[in-house]
């Protein structure tokens, strides 16, 4: 009878995820001004999927060299607005 260590059954990708998360945070810290980082963390608390999409967009832009300098809070707002789906407006006319 052989004994199997319960720790062996843990997935191997957990340390990799922590490293990727740390790398992502380091990159975002380099490309975002403090106010923009604060806004991104607030968005992450409310809408994690939007924050993840925004983070990947920013990291891709930075890796392709499309960013000139750090991103300000105002620029981050513009990027967010461009990423959002257009909303329909309904007008109700009363007679």
Curated annotation (Swiss-Prot):
This is DNA-binding protein CENSYa_1764. The lineage of its organism: Archaea, Nitrososphaerota, Candidatus Cenarchaeales, Candidatus Cenarchaeaceae, Candidatus Cenarchaeum. It comes from the Archaea. One of its GO terms (molecular function) is DNA binding. One of its GO terms (cellular component) is cytosol. Residues 1-21 are annotated as: Disordered. Keywords: DNA-binding. Belongs to the PDCD5 family. The keyword GTP-binding does not apply.
């Amino acid at each position: 009878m052989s004994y199997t260590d319960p720790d062996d059954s843990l997935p191997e990708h957990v340390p990799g995820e922590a490293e990727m998360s740390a790398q992502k945070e380091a990159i975002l810290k380099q490309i975002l001004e403090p106010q923009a980082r604060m806004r991104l963390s607030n968005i992450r608390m409310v809408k994690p999927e939007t924050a993840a999409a925004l983070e990947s967009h920013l990291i891709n832009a930075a890796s392709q060299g499309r960013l000139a300098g750090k991103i300000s809070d105002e620029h981050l707002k513009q990027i967010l607005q461009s990423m959002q789906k257009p909303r329909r407006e309904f007008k109700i006319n009363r007679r």
